[in-house]
A protein has these predicted regions:
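Helix C-cap/helix->beta junction micro-motif
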Residues: 30, 102-103, 174
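Short, acidic loop-to-helix structural element flanking the phosphoryl-transfer center
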Residues: 79-107, 117, 143
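Asp-based, Mg2+/Mn2+-dependent phosphohydrolase catalytic module
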Residues: 1-2, 64, 113, 117-205
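N-terminal helical cap/lid subdomain that shapes the substrate entry/recognition surface
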Residues: 2-90
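Conserved phosphate-coupling serine/threonine residues in phosphotransfer and NTP-handling enzymes
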Residues: 11, 109-111
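Structural motif corresponding to alpha-helix initiation and N-cap regions
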Residues: 36-39, 89, 93, 140-143, ...
Length: 205
């Protein structure tokens, strides 16, 4: 193994408490098209592609309104997270520091452009990562973005760490082992490794 690629939401942090207010501030200007969201609502869609999030949270909105709501929510999300951050899981920096001494670290997340940068900006963790990617920049699926990062950085034997079924499928698409973060937001049908807290990676690798 030469590298570890991380999902972000439900794997390294939980941003929902920070962003729920911003989401509802945007939604309030679309009376009738969308209902306020809760932390539980947001945790239930974490890790999904942005268009799918819109369909699940705002099923009654027409396509044009839904797109506008999502665009504004995504912009608000990046702004709020860059100013306030999210809730990091226990020992995140300690774990990243230890792992980065042995492996190259990366982030591939199903988020909009600017989201990973907001995570970096507030928490100052970018020094531990070599590269990152998301569909907001590439328009690609998570599995394709994992492959892109692998090719761009000449990775031979990475693993992918994530918390939902989509992460498992993306790792499978990329042909690499999947580490299931069971403390995150979802359940998966299978995995190669499992951790019940982030620092479990130090015992695995």
């Amino acid at each position: 193994m030469d590298s570890i690629i991380f999902d972000l939401d439900g794997t390294l942090w939980d941003p929902t408490e920070t962003v729920v207010g911003g989401w509802n501030q945007v939604i309030s200007s679309y009376t009738g098209a969308a209902k306020e969201v809760t932390i539980d609502n947001l945790q239930g869609i974490m890790g999904l592609p942005v268009p799918e999030v819109g369909r699940r949270l705002f099923p009654d909105a027409d396509e044009e309104s839904r797109q506008k709501i999502m665009d504004e929510c995504c912009d608000m999300e990046c702004l709020v997270l860059s100013q306030q951050g999210g809730r990091l899981y226990a020992r995140v920096e300690e774990v990243l520091q230890a792992l980065s001494a042995k492996y190259k670290l990366f982030i591939v997340s199903n988020c909009q452009a600017g989201y990973i940068e907001a995570f970096y900006e507030y928490h100052q963790l970018q020094k531990y990562f070599t590269d990152y990617e998301n569909p907001g920049r590439t328009g690609l699926s998570k599995g394709e973005n994992i492959r892109l990062v692998m090719d761009r950085n000449h990775l031979m034997s990475p693993v992918y760490v994530g918390d939902i079924e989509g992460d498992r499928k993306a790792a499978g698409f990329a042909g690499i082992p999947f580490v299931y973060a069971s403390y995150g937001f979802g359940e998966v049908s299978s995995y190669d490794y499992v951790i019940d807290r982030l620092d479990g990676l130090l015992e695995l690798f």
